[in-house]
Amino acid sequence: MTRHGKNCTAGAVYTYYEKKKDTAASGYGTQTVRLSKDAVKDFDCCCLSLQPCKDPVVTSDGYIYEKEAILEYILHQKKEIARQMKAYDKQKNAKKAEMDELNKAAKESQMKAFLDKEMTIVSKPLNPFTRKSDSGADTAEPSGSQQSSEEKGKQLPSFWIPSLTPEAKTSLVKKPDKTVYCPMSGKPLKMKDLIPVHFTAVDEKVDRVGLINRQDRYVCAVTRDMLGNSVPCAVLRPSGAVVTMECVEKLIKKDMIDPISGDKLHERDIIMLQRGGTGFSGSGVLLQAKEARPVMQA
């Protein structure tokens, strides 16, 4: 085998490596990237700011947010919905005014045609000795094909006038949805549904700055086991305490009583937290990011 035959450009088969390389270099095809540990947030970090929470709150689906960040997000979404609703109302009023103008013009044209018909008198006396074909020879109406061609010509677009081109259509604004949705789960989100979370620090004497710099920051509120990205955790709704799922299964579910506040618990009061990423594929976290791009089809 010659040296030229060992090059990757000499093969007759389009290999998988060449396909991935061309997909990354071109602007077509869905791009897929395997995320590392550095690209996944920790279990106690906000889903919006990706920073450790100072005043954490959790949704019913287990997504943790910084209270200030999620309230600012909800306020921004409500302002955007109000702006879209204002544009929709403006379009609706403009369309209504246009329909009123058209109805008014149609009524005026009908009234004018009726008045013209009533006020018109016969200018030529009818001659009983002439045939209809002779009298109507001078005022012959155009045939049906000519009328249809003229009407079709009026409806054809003028490509040299921007307002009459087929693409020059005003984009209609759809009625916006007034519901604010969670940025992670996509479900409806309300401020009253946010539950405060109270983490139990490893050392109560360490301030917040020193706590953030440590790798192991929080422990279970009941068993004092260390919490981390690889440990399944849950939030108890009445007290907001964070405990491990092992504690929930072995201790709390026997009596269904909150060990911190003493309130009666239900199944919906035990909210499982969405865990952070460990970098391993078996951690239960989606470690693959996709970017949808145009696809070339033959």
From Swiss-Prot:
Transcription regulation among the record's keywords? Answer: no
Annotated GO CC locations: cytoplasm; nucleus
Segments for region (Disordered) = 126-157
Q: Which reaction does it catalyse?
A: S-ubiquitinyl-[E2 ubiquitin-conjugating enzyme]-L-cysteine + [acceptor protein]-L-lysine = [E2 ubiquitin-conjugating enzyme]-L-cysteine + N(6)-ubiquitinyl-[acceptor protein]-L-lysine
What's one Pfam family here?
A: zf-NOSIP
- Report the EC code(s) recorded for this entry: 2.3.2.27
Q: Where is this motif: Nuclear localization signal?
A: 78-101
Against InterPro entries, the record matches this protein to:
NOSIP, Znf-NOSIP, Znf_RING/FYVE/PHD
What keywords does the record list, in alphabetical order?
Cytoplasm, Developmental protein, Nucleus, Transferase, Ubl conjugation pathway
* Stretch forming the signal peptide: none
MF GO annotations: ubiquitin protein ligase activity
Compartment annotation: Cytoplasm; Nucleus
Q: What does this protein do?
A: E3 ubiquitin-protein ligase that is essential for proper development of the forebrain, the eye, and the face. Negatively regulates nitric oxide production by inducing nitric oxide synthase translocation to actin cytoskeleton and inhibiting its enzymatic activity.
UniProt lists the family membership as follows: Belongs to the NOSIP family.
Q: What is this protein called?
A: Nitric oxide synthase-interacting protein
Species of the source:
Xenopus tropicalis
